[in-house]
Amino acid sequence: MDPRFNTAVEYDITLTPEDIDGVIPEDLCGVIFRNGPADFRLAEHEFDGDGMIRRLNIAVDGSVAFLSRYAETAKRRIEADSPTPKVRGFGTQIPGGPLHNMSAARERGNAANTSVMRHGDCILTLWEAGKPYQLNPSDLSTIGPYDFEGQLDAKIPSSAHPKFDPTTNELFNCGIDYGKTTQIVTFRLDRTGKLTTVARTPVAHAPFVHDFALTSKWCVYLVGPADISLRPFLTGLKSVNDSIKWHPERGTQIVLVSRD
């Protein structure tokens, strides 16, 4: 790992107005959550650092509270006292060669380190290839994996970049189902909390689809010419990162999926 990526420590700090130089404007108040990789002890790629959630709370009385906690994922528990990686990540292989990595090919090294969102009274921390983890908003303690009350297909990972439409109170997200035919799975969460699969859209090859855009009518996917070569990954020879190949001759495909 690049030595510039230092492992972060957890903080719980509260400042009163007397502790602050100057005065915070009265209309600047509220809570903001942030997430990102922060523990790089075992990571061979910055995307594999364990996720740390940070909460900054500016109260109406001018006090400021900052809290940061690691998401206590299965990955973090497994690797807590280990000197070497125990779970494959985006760019991290476990020791022991291809056979060890092949046996772990389907384990999801969910680091819960990419983004954070609010869903009702829940705070969810997201990762690109697995279920969200639910956190307690008061102390950021980890409750566990969250599947929207059993509605999220365990076989289809959800993206870490959902899109919310404030005019309809609907949340859209996607996952990639890599199989004999690769499919983009688009799903919608309505204002009542019901999750519906909107479409399963076949695409060529095994594209690396990271994000999408949302309009009033469409979910818009830019499917670029970057593919994941599944064979070297599934046989334990390479990580996901090292299995991504660029095929510029294919160009970029724009896939439109109706929200309805």
What are these regions (language model features)?
Residues 51-55, 183-194, 234-260:
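Beta-propeller blade signature
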